[in-house]
Amino acid sequence: MENNNNNNKNDNEINFKKIEINETLESGKFIESKIDMKLGELIIKVQSPMCFSFHKHLVNQFCFNCFSNSHEINNAKFNKFKVDINKNYIIRCNNCKLIYFCSDECFEKVMSIESFQDSTSTNIHTPLECLILSNYHDQTISPKINTLHDQTENRMIINYLSKIAYSTNNNNKFKLLLIEMNQLIGDFNNDNNNQTLSLNEIKNIKNKSFNLRKLFNNFFFNIDKVIIEELYAKSQRNSFGLWKNSDECFGLSMYGNQTIYNNNNDKDDNISISYFNHSCFPNCVRVQENQSISIYSLIPIKKGDELSISYIDIRMSKNDRLLHLKEIYYFECKCKRCTLPPLSNLSLEIEKTIENYTCKNQSIKCTGILYLPPFNKIQRICNFCHWKEPINN
């Protein structure tokens, strides 16, 4: 056991000792580089989300275990749970009929008793989640505001609550999940946070939390409405879209912390990937690889620099960027690109750099970002469509 732990620490040291959390009154918490970084350096990788949900009209297209597009890799032939949908054999949970898999192996990893008892895997379709989804209706939780985002967010919260309900049954993996979520920032009842949200948004969260609590109470899991309100606030601050490509978002997710080790392989800090702040001129890029999320450096980064990613399409105009960030993420962007005079030399240089690392794949007019992965120093790769461009371009 000691050898395994040491191996894990060494892996984490390689990937994570290069960053740390800093905090200021103006910016709040952010991630800062502890070392000089090269172009294309892997900064952090989180293997799987704490909770997630797919858009309801796409649940039969993506594997609940590996997030693969199940319509592309249907290869299950002898599973009693497979069903014929549009002449494609797909494995699913036959109780709620809302959880699908690409293979027998993925089915077993999520649905088997052995997986539930496994000490590490938290990607489990619990009996409680199955019951809730079988009796769940979007209009019940969000009767007035019922957008696709709301529906997916509700199901993501259900996914999380359905797992921590088992944290009292001597199940350490779900207790750790609870601890990780508690470390994320929501602050729904914080006065400053509620000044950011409109009265309608606050009312919507309160109504959804009340209705969701009532639904769980029907199955004897009693949870305080305030806890659910905080989960919705955390979702607004910490959730990531699940993207098939630059135009197709298929779900929503929240990722927990990664442990950082110092040079002596001692625990140094816990860092959440959600602490990467937004910039319209980012120095890092987010890459989704099935369940995992990786952050790579887009440009050389100096020690002490804040690390940032873009939450939006960086090709948008300044006015569109500001409006989108205000409406969706509830903040006014004050990054260098948004505050510089538009015709200044530095502003023009930034726009030239942005143009250089945006995807050039004209066949689908992709809005992704080209990055240089550590395993390939010859070609840059788009973080969305995976289009490749020779580095000498």
Curated annotation (Swiss-Prot):
Keywords: Methyltransferase, S-adenosyl-L-methionine, Transferase. SUPFAM superfamilies: SET domain. It comes from the Eukaryota. GO terms for molecular function: methyltransferase activity. It is an enzyme of class 2 (transferase). Coiled coil: none annotated. GO terms for cellular component: nucleus. Its EC number is 2.1.1.-. Residues 17-312 form the SET domain. SMART domains: SET. CDD domains: SET_SMYD. Probable methyltransferase. Belongs to the class V-like SAM-binding methyltransferase superfamily. This is SET domain-containing protein DDB_G0283443. It comes from Dictyostelium discoideum.
